[in-house]
């Protein structure tokens, strides 16, 4: 499954996680991506959308 939102372009972020003793380990933060059927240019299509775009109404779902 794609790890990028097709509406806002939000994707995976790389960084460093610190423990209490300040040891480092590399890790990734992935967005909450959902596969939904939406209306794109008048036709229903399956796209990958983050949960924030779904909640804010940037996507019109196909029923």
Swiss-Prot record:
Highest taxon, organism lineage: Bacteria
Q: Which organism is it from?
A: Clostridium kluyveri (strain ATCC 8527 / DSM 555 / NBRC 12016 / NCIMB 10680 / K1)
Which GO molecular-function terms appear in the entry? structural constituent of ribosome
* Family note: Belongs to the bacterial ribosomal protein bL28 family.
Q: Which Pfam families match?
A: Ribosomal_L28
Coiled coil region boundaries: none
Bridged cysteine pairs (disulfide)? none
Q: Which GO terms describe its biological process?
A: translation
Record protein name field: Large ribosomal subunit protein bL28
Task: Name the keywords, alphabetized.
Answer: Ribonucleoprotein, Ribosomal protein
Q: Which InterPro entries match?
A: Bacterial_rp_bL28 (IPR050096), Ribosomal_bL28 (IPR026569), Ribosomal_bL28/bL31-like_sf (IPR034704), Ribosomal_bL28_bact-type (IPR001383), Ribosomal_bL28_sf (IPR037147)
Q: Which GO terms describe its cellular component?
A: ribonucleoprotein complex; ribosome
């Amino acid at each position: 499954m794609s790890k990028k939102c097709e509406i806002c372009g939000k994707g995976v972020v790389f960084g460093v996680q610190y423990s209490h003793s300040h040891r480092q380990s590399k890790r990734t933060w992935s967005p909450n991506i959902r596969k939904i059927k939406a209306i794109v240019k008048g036709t229903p299509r399956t796209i990958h959308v983050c949960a924030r775009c779904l909640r804010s109404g940037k996507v019109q779902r196909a029923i």
